[in-house]
């Protein structure tokens, strides 16, 4: 499918640089194919769903995955570099996107330290060896530390990995450490936030409980590949980077019971949706899942496990806009995004939200 079909004009001013405050004050656009668009608020979500429905949250926790350091090579001078960790392959190995990747080669040693430091003492530094250099700036790093010791070093020396469209406009600050983390995050490992979840405050979660809506947690450690642009002209030529997900047997049983009684499984974010679809059989039965998924969803995909989706507003030509177009229909989403832009909705990670229903979904009294 041609990538330019997913292009649209997005004013730069529409990209939010800060989230709404409080976090549940964001706007919510309800999109049901065939029905008028409805301008609501995130706080309306409990009233827009039915008792017995299940909201599925991704409980991954963002780690400070952006590391700055100095490359050292025998007979050469030091070279500043940056690595954005995106996939852990072993207790001491991470795949990362490096800058400048062309200046790195297998065998190079890198001393990572505090942001912008040119000299780092042995006690505060983190050493790694470049084992591979791949395409698109990707490298494989083998660290001298392993397991929890490596986790502790990354937590102490790394910086929060804000998305490029935000980080390019302003520096990361202390407020981002709270803003760019869901209130229910508990499983460290993501290098990008599951941003649809950023809208949920403790008060909103309490309202969801009071409305009789189930809350279910799964884990997908979001990788930096979510920030990568689609450079191919056709979706068939684009390769998704793998991400690690976990959905246990008890969770699978709960979700299957929700659908068996006629209620809906509502994914909070594209990351939760991708994990659910990766775990589902062709008949929609959700199975336990533990491992990597590189599922790439474009129009024509038949959804198996998800009945509605809460998600932010995504960038043009992105894999995420392709996914929502597959879910609700390309024409529907192009019209919804045109309305959102004209109505001043805020886009991207810190922006507003939408509640999407799939093509062919029956009209619900709670939405009309």
Swiss-Prot record:
It is found in: Cytoplasm. Pathway: tRNA modification; tRNA-queuosine biosynthesis. Keywords: Cytoplasm, Queuosine biosynthesis, S-adenosyl-L-methionine, Transferase. The keyword Calcium does not apply. The keyword Protein transport does not apply. Transfers and isomerizes the ribose moiety from AdoMet to the 7-aminomethyl group of 7-deazaguanine (preQ1-tRNA) to give epoxyqueuosine (oQ-tRNA). This is S-adenosylmethionine:tRNA ribosyltransferase-isomerase.
